[in-house]
């Protein structure tokens, strides 16, 4: 779709019991490529979650990749891929290969590593042509070649991208704009 995917207007975003971010107004368009910057605890993850919730888009249209996953979630992802029709599974395998992960070997793994789980979830999302990719510290648990392959895949991705990362080189390669989050404000 063209146009707006998410709109936040003068929102106050809580984390636990206190507002972390105040007076947040932000529009995510179909072609947005946004880097959220700021120190640890500033509210980058909170803003990502708020954008996901405000989008109103189905989980089929949004890829949300949180900073941390557990092994149980990764095993669920493997089962999901194995249960896909052949054509869809083939698209996931193509993306996995582009991310430097041999798909057949990964499918035989009983418990994927955190890096493999990130690649698997990203492959699932990109293979189903989501409209919005939201990534929280996507380079965690990835080696340098994997980071470079992920960067290339995201550069080629045609939809909206919002990511929170401390990896400025990765953000510069994949995003066209950035917002600084600090002291409860988004600038």
What residue ranges belong to the model's regions?
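ABC ATP-binding cassette signature C-motif
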Residues: 2-187
